[in-house]
């Protein structure tokens, strides 16, 4: 999965801002979501992103997987990401 071509992003220590230039809608998300977005931009698989976040934060991998999947599903619903 990768960011859709009509989406622009800005990542900071505070999190993530996404702009859908096709609709003019703006979305914001927390710093962990920003890490997921960065991983998707780099072409990483979601499983690799989840493993990295769990290892770096010490969070339960099951919880990270649940939250990451929920975030990515929200991106899909809004057509902000697309399959390779």
Q: Model regions: which residues?
A:
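Long, charge-rich, low-complexity alpha-helical segments
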Residues: 12, 25-84
């Amino acid at each position: 999965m990768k960011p859709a071509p009509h989406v622009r992003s800005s990542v900071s220590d505070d999190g993530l801002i996404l702009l859908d230039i096709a609709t003019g809608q703006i979305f914001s998300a927390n710093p962990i979501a920003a890490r997921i977005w960065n991983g998707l931009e780099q072409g990483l698989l979601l499983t690799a992103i989840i493993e990295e976040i769990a290892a770096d934060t010490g969070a339960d991998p099951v919880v990270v997987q649940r939250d990451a999947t929920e975030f990515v599903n929200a991106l899909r619903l809004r057509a902000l990401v697309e399959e390779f």
